[in-house]
Structure formats: C-alpha cells, structure tokens
Amino acid sequence: MGKIFFYEERNFQGRHYECGSDYSDLSSYFNRCNSIRVEGGNWILYEHPSYKGNQYYLWKGEYPDFQRWMGFNDSIRSCRFLPNYQGQYKMRIYERGDYQGQMMEFFDDCPNTYERFNFHDIHSCNVFDGHWMFYEEPNYRGRQYYLRPGEYRRYNDWGASSPRIGSFRRVYHRF
C-alpha cells in the first residue's frame, strides 16, 4: 500500500498531511507544499485540484524541497496513487494529431527523442500497455505528463500546452 506525507515547510517541517489514496482536492489539508516524504508506492502529484496543472512523478524517497521533484512552485492540490503494473509496455507515438504522420512503436524508455528519431514534437499517441511519463526536455527533465492506457488524439489530451516531448519512460514500481 502506498503512503505519502505532504509538509508545508522545507525539510519536512510545519503542518503535514498523510495520504494513502487518490485525492482530487487537497486544499483543505494544507496551504502549500514545500517537502514530501514517500514511504510507499508511486505517485502523480498535480498543481491544481481535479488532477489539473503541472504533473510530478514521485516514488519512494525524500524530497526536502519542491525543486527535488522538479516542481515550479509550492502548489500541490491533487494526487493519484499509481497501481502496481507487472505486464508489458507498448505505446505508439505520431508526429501529427489524430494518429497521422510518421508512427513509431515503443516498448522501452527513450532518454532523447531527437537523437532516437530526429524530431521532438509528438502530437498524438496510443498507449496500449503500461503507464508512461512524457517529459518536455531530454533526460527526463522539464514538465511531466502522465499517460495511462488510452487514446491521446492531441497533445492537450495528456495535459500539455505544446507537442514538445524531449524524453519518455515507463512507470514501474520503485519500492
């Protein structure tokens, strides 16, 4: 079972809240989030309620300030516990929206999309198996986007404001 602790101050100080499941609105439990301790499971955190805004992928460990989870500010307002997935991973990406243009199929991580297939704009994708994270920059940096099995006809379907994806990786449990 997963468990995550949110702290209002850096270095695990101040008011805190313990969470063990999905919450669509954490606003009533704390005003800001400057440090996090994950004691179990993998989590996706969201900047705004209802799983909106910037997304952050965290696993077991300590995050003494929001820069450690690549946060842009101290706002965490919703969270999702990621289910344990043991199967295969499969995803198709497309260089244009609505599954048009060049298509590539992936079963593993890609630290640099430009080096791998000479473009870094992904306009649509289809996740068949597994859970994946897209990153705006190479080497798993920049804004993050969580994708679970399903169809993503346009980049805004996964929460992005542009099609730029510099890297992606499979979400697997890091207990």
From Swiss-Prot:
Crystallins are the dominant structural components of the vertebrate eye lens. PANTHER family: BETA/GAMMA CRYSTALLIN, GAMMA-CRYSTALLIN-1. One of its GO terms (biological process) is visual perception. This is Gamma-crystallin-1. Residues 84-88 are annotated as: Connecting peptide. One of its GO terms (molecular function) is structural constituent of eye lens. Monomer. It holds the Pfam family Crystall. Gene3D superfamilies: Crystallins. Has a two-domain beta-structure, folded into four very similar Greek key motifs. Residues 2-40, 41-83, 89-129, 130-172 form the Beta/gamma crystallin 'Greek key' domain. Belongs to the beta/gamma-crystallin family. The lineage of its organism: Eukaryota, Metazoa, Chordata, Craniata, Vertebrata. The keyword Lyase does not apply. Keywords: Eye lens protein, Repeat. InterPro entries: Beta/Gamma-Crystallin (IPR050252), Beta/gamma_crystallin (IPR001064), G_crystallin-like (IPR011024). Signal peptide: none annotated.
